[in-house]
């Protein structure tokens, strides 16, 4: 009986097992059939990887109108966007997996040992003996010649340490590299354990709920798996749920599932293959189950355009979140590569350490290698920062809905980007300044050493091309005025600018810097006899290099003299007189009222035609005078169209910047005032004693007096364009003429003294010529200019300087 019972039990058990096996096979076949697949379960460090459950290509937008002609095209465009985002997610996830977990040091440890031994033995065989003899001789020199026993002993011990430590490292380089790498990985794991303790408070669903499943000893791998799940959820999973279910919570979506025994709603939608039959079955499932049973409006035909707009979120999120995550993995891998490169140079460093002056080279190289491993361990701090930051943002701003999801992504991306730019500050803060950089400021060094020099060189090349264009422009300016009035020698006639255009402007010369030069003084000899003469001048041209050289010299002289001026010294001492400033400001205002400044900047010594004209004019008798007012008016109109007539002297050939005549006001005020008073008296006496009828001849013979010709310059705004009619009359008592032998006196700020102006429109001058009984005398109408009293700027400066000195003395006495 007992035997029969045992047989029955065995038969029943066999039948039950057979039935269960068949049922399991049927279930598996029905679940993983021709059109669907089952989700894969793959773990890393004890954490399941969500990105491995289904292929990334199945994360698409699903809609019942996918076969429609127009709306189907929009569904296809939405899926193209999801495909682009999926490729980015695939790259970042693979990079995090490989670059974090790949250990090139462990792979090349044995090879490193063999290479180090071979290189060290080769160098030692060829150079070791000579370097050993040199070191021994140096120790003997220190001991015997210099008598430094302490230094000789130190060098000997250091040499022995180099030989011993170098030999030990070369024989076991691979083992030491593995040990250091393992220590850095262990340090990273321990640092991340602290983060897992904070994240361990999560008990419900979420990406951080799996942190408690991290296996011991695999903290780094498990933490990286959690971060991979986090990135996948933000970049691809959440946009997929929003587009297809209009919800971001997987728990809420699966609660409505009526088929509790099979796959949930999300897995069911992802389980369909992308084959023709799979797409047909998925479309039937969408119409019958999602739309009819679950009332899912997100997959209806009217939501096609909304799905297209929401799909772009996946692309943005995958890029802005993926860059910081991938950068951390890249730096972790880069540090290991740097360590391998340093190890390759260790044998050379220890051979050079045989030289006494380079005894520390081997130890320094090993120190750099140790710092790389320390930096690799400190990289765990950055990973912990990202890990904890993602957790905090996920808890404070849970992505429960489309708006909250967008806010979560924006805040997390901003924090990660700020942390990425401040990575060196984080490491420096944690290590108390011992480690100051994660990547040794690689990006900034690349910008300064590669990008910036290339940009500067490109700017120089662009500047050369720009200068070439400027030279062509100047060439066209110089020769643009040559039209119909050229003679056999190629000389132009009257300039096309008319009487109102100065010579420099009419010839096309650059007059940018002409305002800082001394005014061109024209002679009175050119006023006589113009009815039968017409002056033709050749255009005086200089090369571009000579013009630039003259400008540079003028600016250099002006700068040097300005620094040496008395006013500059007062300003350096901190003395600023309000009265002096007011006086200088008044001088600046009066500057525009003074003598017109010649536009043409060419060298006056080359204008020989004017010399010849003046000499011929002096030799001719004074018997050609004008006879009527009409001829005089005609001559004045023709004169305005001619080039200015100049008289050469020493000062004209040595024209420099106005600032070259700056001198010390305090030491020469009294002498200057006396000289000016004497000149005024002399001018008055001469002008009162000369007859009116002989004034023209006297002015021609007096080579020390010059009168500015009425050359209107409307472009600079000094005078209005009108012809001046001058009559012979004694000069007023308050008028002062400038001798050609005297340089124009200028204040230290470049302001010409009012008393030394050749012609100023605002001066108090009234010139007239009275009619003579002779038949050849021509009567000219009197022209008066608005006059007002002027005070010498030199006098104002002298008074201001004296007041400043008195004030300083009072301040010193009060102290």
UniProtKB/Swiss-Prot annotation:
Entries under InterPro entries matching the protein: MetI-like
Skewed-composition ranges (Basic and acidic residues): 544-563, 599-614, 648-658, 696-705, 734-757, 796-815
Disordered: annotated span: 483-815
Locations listed in the record: Cell membrane
Polar residues compositional bias, start-end: 513-543, 619-630, 665-678, 720-732, 773-793
Keyword Signal among UniProt keywords: yes
GO BP of this protein: transmembrane transport
Stretches that traverse the bilayer: 127-147, 157-177, 311-331, 333-353, 372-392, 401-421
GO CC terms, sorted: plasma membrane
Keyword set, alphabetical order: Cell membrane, Membrane, Signal, Transmembrane, Transmembrane helix
Stretch forming the signal peptide: 1-25
Membrane topology note: Multi-pass membrane protein
Protein known as: Uncharacterized membrane protein YddG
Designated gene of the protein: yddG
């Amino acid at each position: 009986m007992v035997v029969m019972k045992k047989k029955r039990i065995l038969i029943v058990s066999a039948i039950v097992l057979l039935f269960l096996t068949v049922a399991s096979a049927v279930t598996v076949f029905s679940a993983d059939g021709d059109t669907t697949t089952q989700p894969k379960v793959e773990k890393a460090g004890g954490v399941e990887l969500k990105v491995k459950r289904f292929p990334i290509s199945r994360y698409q937008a699903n809609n019942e109108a996918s076969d429609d002609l127009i709306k189907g095209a929009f569904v296809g465009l939405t899926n193209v966007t999801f495909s682009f985002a999926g490729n980015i997610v695939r790259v970042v996830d693979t990079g995090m997996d490989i670059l974090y977990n790949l250990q090139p040091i462990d792979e090349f440890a044995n090879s490193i040992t063999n290479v180090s031994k071979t290189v060290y033995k080769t160098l030692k065989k060829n150079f070791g003996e000579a370097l050993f003899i040199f070191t021994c001789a140096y120790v003997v020199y220190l001991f015997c010649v210099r008598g430094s026993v302490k230094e000789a002993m130190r060098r000997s011990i250091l040499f022995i340490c180099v030989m011993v430590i170098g030999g030990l490292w070369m024989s076991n380089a691979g083992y030491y590299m593995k040990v250091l790498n393992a220590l850095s990985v262990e340090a990273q794991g321990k640092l991340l354990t602290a983060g897992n303790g904070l994240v361990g408070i999560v008990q419900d669903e979420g990406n951080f709920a799996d942190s408690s499943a991290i296996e011991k000893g695999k903290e780094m791998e498990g933490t990286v798996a959690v971060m991979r799940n986090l990135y996948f959820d933000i970049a691809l999973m959440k946009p997929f749920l929003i587009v297809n279910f209009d919800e971001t919570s997987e728990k809420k979506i699966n609660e409505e599932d009526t088929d509790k025994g099979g796959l949930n709603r999300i897995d069911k939608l992802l389980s369909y293959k992308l084959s023709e039959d799979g797409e047909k079955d998925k479309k039937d499932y969408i119409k019958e189950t999602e739309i009819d049973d679950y009332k899912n409006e997100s997959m209806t035909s009217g939501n096609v355009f909304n799905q297209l707009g929401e799909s772009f979120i996946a692309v943005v999120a995958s890029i802005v979140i993926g860059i910081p995550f991938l950068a951390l993995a890249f730096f972790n891998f880069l540090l290991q590569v740097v360590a391998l490169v340093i190890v390759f140079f260790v044998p050379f460093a220890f051979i050079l350490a045989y030289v006494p002056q380079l005894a520390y080279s081997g130890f320094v190289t090993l120190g750099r290698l140790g710092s790389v491993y320390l930096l690799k361990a400190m990289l765990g701090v950055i990973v912990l920062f990202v890990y904890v930051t993602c957790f905090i943002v996920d808890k404070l701003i849970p992505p429960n809905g489309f708006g909250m999801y967008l806010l979560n992504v924006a805040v997390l991306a901003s924090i990660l980007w700020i942390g990425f730019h401040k990575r060196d500050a984080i490491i420096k803060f944690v290590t108390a300044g011992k480690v100051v950089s994660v990547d040794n400021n690689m990006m900034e060094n690349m910008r300064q050493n590669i990008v910036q020099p290339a940009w500067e060189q490109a700017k120089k090349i662009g500047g050369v091309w720009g200068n070439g264009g400027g030279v062509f422009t100047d060439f066209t300016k110089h020769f643009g005025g040559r039209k119909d009035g050229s003679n056999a020698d190629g000389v132009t006639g009257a300039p096309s600018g008319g009487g109102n255009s100065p010579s420099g402007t009419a010839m096309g010369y650059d007059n940018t810097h002409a305002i800082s030069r001394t005014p061109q003084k024209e002679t009175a000899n050119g006023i006589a006899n113009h009815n039968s003469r017409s002056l033709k001048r050749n255009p005086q041209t200089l090369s571009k290099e000579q013009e630039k050289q003259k400008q540079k010299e003028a600016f250099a002289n002006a700068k040097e003299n300005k620094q040496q001026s008395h006013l500059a010294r007062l300003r350096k001492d901190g003395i600023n007189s309000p009265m002096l400033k007011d006086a200088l400001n008044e001088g600046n205002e009066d500057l525009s009222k003074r003598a017109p400044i010649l536009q043409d900047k060419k060298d006056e010594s080359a204008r020989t035609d004017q010399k010849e004209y003046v000499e011929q004019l002096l030799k001719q008798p004074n018997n050609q005078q004008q006879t009527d007012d009409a001829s005089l008016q005609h001559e004045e109109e023709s004169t305005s169209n001619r080039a200015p007539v100049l008289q050469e002297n020493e000062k004209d050939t040595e024209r420099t910047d106005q600032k070259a005549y700056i001198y010390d006001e305090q030491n020469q005020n009294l002498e200057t005032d006396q000289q000016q008073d004497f000149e005024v008296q002399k001018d008055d006496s001469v002008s009162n004693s000369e007859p009116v009828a002989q004034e023209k001849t006297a002015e021609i013979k007096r080579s020390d007096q010059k009168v500015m010709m009425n050359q209107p310059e409307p472009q600079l705004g000094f005078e209005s364009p009108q012809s001046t009619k001058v009559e012979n009359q004694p000069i007023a008592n308050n008028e002062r003429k400038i001798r050609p032998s005297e340089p124009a006196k200028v204040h230290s700020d470049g302001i010409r003294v009012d008393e030394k102006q050749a012609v100023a429109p605002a001066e108090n001058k009234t010139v007239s010529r009275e009619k003579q009984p002779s038949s050849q005398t021509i009567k000219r109408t009197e022209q008066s200019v608005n006059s007002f009293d002027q005070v010498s700027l030199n006098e104002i400066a002298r008074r201001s300087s004296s007041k400043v000195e008195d004030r300083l003395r009072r301040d010193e006495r009060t102290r």
